[in-house]
From Swiss-Prot:
Entry EC no(s): 2.7.7.6
One Gene Ontology MF term: DNA binding
GO biological process: DNA-templated transcription
The family this protein is said to belong to: Belongs to the RNA polymerase subunit omega family.
Cellular-component GO terms for this entry: DNA-directed RNA polymerase complex
Reactions accelerated catalytically: RNA(n) + a ribonucleoside 5'-triphosphate = RNA(n+1) + diphosphate
Organism: Paracoccus denitrificans (strain Pd 1222)
Gene designation per UniProt: rpoZ
Function summary: Promotes RNA polymerase assembly. Latches the N- and C-terminal regions of the beta' subunit thereby facilitating its interaction with the beta and alpha subunits.
Gene3D superfamilies the record matches: 3.90.940.10
Alphabetized UniProt keyword annotations: DNA-directed RNA polymerase, Nucleotidyltransferase, Transcription, Transferase
Protein name listed in UniProt: DNA-directed RNA polymerase subunit omega
This protein's record includes keyword Secreted: no
């Protein structure tokens, strides 16, 4: 069996950097348990991935999309949770005043009115 070389794959992926990135990603997929699309023939995963690219059993566009998805970081965007202090402050403003506070305010008003008359 002839060994696969990079030259066999350059026809499919002209940029050698892209070829190396795609072959490395496919080799990691194989190592993770992805099914092979060519016979292994006692070759290691990087060689198998290059053979798959050369034989076009792995479409380059699909492989590129999978590689991009694997490199992307998913960030969840949720509404910020209100912290406990904000909740407490909001509850303080919405809460009706107790009768004691109302009577204190009323007494203070009466005292100020009485001082204003004198």
């Amino acid at each position: 069996m002839a060994r696969v070389t990079v030259e066999d794959c350059v026809d499919k992926v002209p940029n050698r950097f892209d070829l190396v990135m795609l072959a490395a990603h496919r080799a990691r997929e194989i190592a993770a348990g992805s099914p092979l699309t060519v016979d292994r023939d006692n070759d290691k995963n990087p060689v198998v991935s290059l053979r798959e690219i050369a034989d076009e059993t792995q479409p380059v566009d699909d492989l590129r999309e999978r590689m991009i998805e694997a490199q992307q970081t998913q960030i969840e965007v949720d509404e910020p949770e209100e912290d406990a202090m904000a909740l407490l402050l909001g509850a303080e403003m919405d809460r009706p005043k107790p009768a004691d506070e109302e009577s204190e305010e009323r007494m203070l008003r009466m005292m100020l009115e009485a001082q204003g008359r004198n």
